[in-house]
Amino acid sequence: MRNQRGKGPENPGRLLKRLMGMLMKHYGVAIIIVAICIIINVLANVQGTMFMQRLIDDYITPLLKSETKNYTPLLHAIGRVACFYGIGIIASYSYNRIMVNVTQGMLKTFRDSMFTKMEQLPIKYFDTHAHGDIMSMYTNDTDTLRQMISQSMPQLFNSAITIISTTVCMFMLNIPLTALTFFMVGIMLVLTRKIGGLSAKHFIAQQKDIGTVNGYIEEMMQGQRVVKVFCHEEESKEAFDKLNDALCESSYKANNYSNVLGPINAQLGNISYVLCAIVGGVLAIGNVGGFTLGGLASFLTFNKNFNMPINQISMQINAIVMALAGAERIFNLLDEEPEVDEGYVELVNAKRENGQLVPSEKRTGLWAWAHKHTNGDPTTYVELKGDVVFDDVDFGYTDDKIVLHNVSMFAQPGQKLAFVGSTGAGKTTITNLINRFYDIQDGKIRYDGININKIKKADLRRSLGIVLQDTHLFSMSVRENIRYGRLDATDEEVEAAAKLANADGFIRRLPQGYDTVLTGDGANLSQGQRQLLAIARAAIADPPALILDEATSSIDTRTERLVQDGMDKLMHGRTTFVIAHRLSTIQNSDCIMVLEQGRIIERGTHEELLEKKGRYYQLYTGNAVLA
């Protein structure tokens, strides 16, 4: 979860150590080469600056006093200075090029790791985290890491080496001037600590507000139709303005403090330079301690070089704090517990040989559960029939709030079970338990006599085709959207599935037919057409059992007939669980379960429930609300 607004990372030292550990693991050799190049660059510049003393004292000054001007020694000396700085330029160019590769490589590693972990997380994680906040990790937080790896870390190391080498050289040149320089630097450090701390706090708040704004924008983009239907454009704009104002305020404060710090330190550096020039000039004129004009020129250059990294460090502190805050969120994601799967029973294609079930490498239309025994006995194969039993099941999304109570039911192979009830009755929750998006607190769920906890989750879900009320379509062709149900399906199988779902007709009327690329989650398709594609996607998977969340309440009558006909074809011969939104679509169900506050209060066929004149009767006659 995100840090509290304005609160920095809890353990920056641990985060930095972990980040450096990842860098060294993936790019250890490159980092060492970069460090060597930085050291060479700094030492080359320091050597060039130190040589300036000799250049002035041993070459320029004697040349000015000499009556015969021989410039050859001076040119040789200038050539040596040029060599020093040339080496520095080459080293600087080299480490910057290497850091580009390291930075982009690490960002790729982070994104790969984040996406891999995201795919391993349970549905519960996405139910409890804003999607915009997760997206912000991939964009904003990784960008702060990019700045830290590519700029802040090399500059900090460069600054540290520069400060150490420059300090040594300044002490060698003149101790009193070095003490004066340190006094001014002390003032700069005090201001940096004070102002930098305030700035860092607001930069953390800025990161939090960016994630909030991103989340709201994504939510509004997805719900734009709803906004326009209810004419809530102004209200949405007002809500956005409040969030945007908070972001603007935190950004203003963060950058205001940050922007003040640089100029203040720069001016203090200039004051330090002027004071050293005045005092050093007096010392050089009086030749105090053998201090010369060349020594003064070198020292003033070192003074500038010393103040510059101090200023750079102060400017990079906020970038590092922001990056570590982003790294903390990324590492929190990477440290999330993946979805636990202790199952060992697998789903396999099967065939019969000599009256016995055996596995098949080809799709045969016959499925079996492969039960591998740990005691060395041969694998047992149990035919998948679609026999599902709930035995006294209790469930709550949190331990202190149970939403399903003592639910017991059974679905025989090929039966159609329908769930009806008001909003929050527990209809969708039951289907979430069947495919183990969540695990139950008490009781048992058996699938063909096997406790579903023993079945591998991927195999369990592969046996269950799901058609959701809100169909999600990917930014790919219609053909590939259908093929998503089974990636190895041929074009002929895709078109056959579309025909079974009654989707072939409208697909062929699209501009490029099956090759039409859908964008915006298929926004240019009607709800009914989207539902038909969802049915085709489930049909191509050819699952032994189905979970249908009907969406016929939001489509026209003609399309409803097409959708219902497609669903009927898909349900034929399969155990099917239906979340009903229209009672007219489930009258032919083998059993209808009426739920209320997480309990099954009625069950039976359509006719049996009408005869009871209970809750179902009220729903059917319009005396109660169905959702």
Predicted regions and their residues:
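ABC-type nucleotide-binding domain
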Residues: 67-68, 350-627
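Helix-loop-helix
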Residues: 62, 169-183, 253, 257-328, ...
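An intracellular "coupling" helix at the cytosolic face of ABC transporter transmembrane type-1 domains
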Residues: 123-124, 142-149, 153, 157, ...
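Transmembrane helices of ABC transporter permease
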Residues: 26, 30-43, 84, 90, ...
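Juxtamembrane helix-loop junctions of ABC transporter transmembrane domains
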Residues: 5-13, 44-60, 83-131, 135, ...
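Conserved catalytic Walker-motif region of ABC-type ATPase nucleotide-binding domains
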Residues: 118, 240, 390-392
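Hydrophobic patch in the ABC ATPase nucleotide-binding domain
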Residues: 123, 226, 336-339, 494, ...
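Membrane-integrated ABC transporters
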Residues: 1-45, 60-81, 95-99, 103, ...
